[in-house]
């Protein structure tokens, strides 16, 4: 009876737990860091998209003129600019399409104009919103402005702004620009196929053979991560350029163009693909191979029916990562691309070369599309890769096979020789007096203060940027990841934060840098004061590399038992004590990994900062680009190698600190 009575009770109101001080503080931290991502990422991208859809055209119906006789008398006749243009044919419809910074001289409407003439001119707009310039003076409104002939030649029209698809129409109707899309896609696909194939062979050799020196080969394979993407381009010029050591190997072909871009892309994307594929092969289940052996399947059949299916997600993920890296890279095609245009270089040419910011924004949007598609597919693939290993899985262990092991050793040796050769030729070129005429050794190429590019100050700026990025980036990323992972409830806010945290990985550095110009260079923006300072370089670098750092921190935090929070709550300890005394010490290895990741990428990045540096904040990676542009290729190679050695030193320091930290704070892991 009692059970029936209880069952008959009407449902009551849902009781929600009252939020405590810690809950509000943690949600506040999420809001603050989310605001940072909105200001540093979402709003600049919105500004760039707005610029891409902003069209400018000279509206001749908005301007009217009066012309006096030689005695300075006006007869009251009013001419519109449109009427004068129809009569004289001074400007075609294409001439009237403009950018925001373009100007149109009004003297073009008067074929007989002479600045020595005694004729006087009057100009006005047809509405109060119409503006024109008389020299540096900005004039507006419907009031007549009078000019003598000498002053009239300084009067120019400003284009009228509107919103539409005009910029995209112009882009896709320009064959040279559209060809860049095809070039970028072809180069990226070819580079991806070759790189993933080579990386798979290398990773397979490391995981499935018993060859010697695996650690050394793995170390060499990671070296390209420590140099800017421009460096392999410089090395290829010294090897296969017009005065290269191995020019004859090209058999009349030029290294400047697709061949050079593909070869250089293989070099700098190889470690990324190798790491992903190595991880995929490392989680193979030995029971599947035992089953194949018991069924008397050949090694070839086992490879295609067990190994490849087991590594398929890693291969797909590696392919899209490499594709994204190649299609968004700017430094390499800028150095060795020659006349072979690609999208990333087109952005640079439109913005720096032609000052056409609207078209630069359009190219950025076009580049954003394949990058977003590749990123989205990669994320889908990574989600499907979960739970490939079960609790009953057995880790695969390679068995000695002398012939196979030597084959793997030879293969890895060839790859290692290629990587060492690229780095070695750069160092050799940096020590040569004058290639190829005077091959005596000298340190003259390290006299950076005598070269264009920023000198040694650029190198010091890079170290400063890397240290600031590593420190502030690690703090922001880890605090943000902690708040998202450890905050209870607040599902909508945490989901929104995760979305913002994932966005930077899909945004090419060139696109982010251009977006920063539109957003932070706006005088109406209260944050305009950070433009052209070290602060904006730090901000853009942290934002550009935020996603990988966030995922690293989140992975480390997910490995911690949630009981820590429950125990702290039962002891009435505030969350910040748990954070400082437990979470940070436990996750210290991951924190150190985040800091070195940010440091190395800040030293090598080009695309994210190429639009944002000033004369006082030039960086080493930018100095490499500028010295190469100026023809100082050997000093450019020397600066590139300085970046390499700095990153090696940083890695060694990181390894030493990590080892000490593991001994002092992570001994519990071995119990």
Predicted regions and their residues:
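Transmembrane alpha-helical segments of polytopic membrane transport and secretion proteins
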Residues: 1-31, 378-414, 492, 655-671
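Peri-membrane helix termini and adjoining interfacial loops of integral membrane proteins
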Residues: 6-9, 60, 158-164, 239-250, ...
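Membrane-helix/interface signature in polytopic inner-membrane proteins
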Residues: 279-289, 299, 554-564
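The alpha-helix within a helix-turn-helix
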Residues: 292, 568
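Glycine-rich helix-loop "coupling/hinge" segments at transmembrane-helix boundaries
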Residues: 330-354, 436-439, 606-633, 667-671
């Amino acid at each position: 009876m009692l059970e029936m009575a209880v069952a008959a009770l009407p449902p009551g109101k849902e009781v929600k737990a009252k939020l405590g001080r810690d809950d509000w503080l943690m949600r506040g931290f999420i809001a603050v860091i989310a605001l940072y991502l909105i200001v540093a990422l979402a709003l600049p991208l919105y500004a760039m998209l707005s610029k891409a859809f902003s069209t400018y055209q000279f509206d001749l119906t908005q301007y009217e003129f009066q012309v006096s006789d030689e005695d300075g008398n006006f007869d009251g006749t009013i001419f519109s600019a449109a009427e004068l243009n129809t009569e004289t044919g001074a400007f075609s419809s294409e001439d009237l399409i403009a950018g925001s910074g373009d100007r149109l001289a009004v003297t073009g409407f008067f074929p007989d104009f002479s600045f020595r003439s005694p004729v006087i001119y009057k100009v006005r707009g047809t509405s109060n919103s119409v503006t024109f310039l008389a020299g540096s003076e900005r004039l507006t409104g419907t009031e007549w402005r009078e000019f003598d002939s000498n002053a009239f030649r300084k009067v120019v029209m400003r284009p009228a702004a509107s919103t539409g698809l005009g910029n995209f129409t112009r882009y896709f109707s320009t064959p040279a620009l559209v060809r860049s899309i095809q070039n970028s896609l072809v180069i990226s696909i070819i580079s991806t196929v070759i790189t993933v194939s080579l990386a798979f062979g290398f990773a397979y050799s490391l995981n499935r053979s018993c060859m010697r020196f695996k650690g050394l080969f793995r170390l060499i394979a990671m070296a390209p991560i420590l140099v800017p993407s421009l460096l392999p381009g410089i090395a290829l010029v010294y090897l296969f350029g017009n005065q290269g050591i191995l020019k004859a190997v090209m058999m009349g072909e030029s290294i400047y163009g697709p061949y050079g871009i593909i070869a250089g892309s293989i070099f700098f994307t190889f470690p990324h693909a190798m790491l992903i594929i190595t991880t995929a092969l490392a989680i193979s289940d030995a029971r599947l191979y035992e089953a194949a052996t018991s069924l008397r399947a050949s090694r070839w059949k086992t490879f295609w029916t067990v190994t490849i299916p087991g590594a398929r997600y890693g291969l797909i993920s590696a392919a899209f990562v490499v594709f994204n890296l190649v299609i968004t890279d700017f430094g390499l095609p800028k150095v060795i691309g020659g006349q072979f245009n690609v999208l990333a270089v087109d952005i640079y040419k439109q913005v720096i070369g032609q000052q056409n910011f609207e078209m630069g924004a359009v190219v950025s949007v076009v580049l954003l599309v394949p990058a977003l598609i590749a990123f989205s597919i990669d994320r889908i693939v990574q989600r499907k890769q979960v739970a490939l290993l079960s609790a009953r899985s057995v880790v695969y262990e390679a068995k000695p096979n002398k012939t196979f092991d030597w084959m793997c050793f030879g293969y890895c040796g060839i790859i290692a020789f290629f990587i060492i050769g690229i780095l070695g030729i750069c160092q050799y070129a940096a020590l040569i007096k004058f290639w190829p005429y005077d091959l005596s050794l000298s340190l003259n190429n390290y006299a950076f203060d005598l070269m264009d590019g920023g000198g040694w100050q650029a190198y010091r700026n890079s170290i400063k940027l890397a240290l600031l990025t590593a420190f502030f980036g690690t703090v922001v990323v880890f605090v943000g990841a902690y708040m998202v992972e450890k905050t209870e409830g607040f599902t909508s806010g945490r989901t929104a934060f995760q979305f913002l945290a994932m966005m930077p990985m899909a945004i090419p550095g060139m696109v982010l840098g251009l977006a920063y110009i539109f957003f932070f260079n706006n005088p109406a923006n209260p944050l305009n004061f950070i433009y052209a300072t070290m602060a904006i370089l730090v901000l853009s670098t942290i934002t550009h590399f935020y996603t990988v750092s966030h995922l690293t921190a989140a992975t480390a935090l997910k490995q911690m038992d949630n009981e820590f929070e429950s125990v702290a709550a039962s002891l009435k300890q505030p969350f910040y004590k748990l954070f400082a005394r437990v979470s940070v010490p436990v996750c210290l290895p991951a924190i150190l990994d985040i800091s070195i990741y940010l440091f190395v990428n800040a030293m090598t990045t080009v695309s994210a900062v190429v639009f944002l540096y000033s004369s006082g904040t030039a960086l080493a990676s930018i100095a490499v680009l500028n010295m190469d542009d100026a023809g100082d290729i050997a000093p450019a190679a020397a600066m590139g190698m300085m970046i390499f050695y700095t990153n090696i030193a940083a890695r060694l320091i990181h390894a030493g600190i990590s080892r000490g930290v593991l001994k002092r704070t992570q001994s519990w892991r071995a119990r």
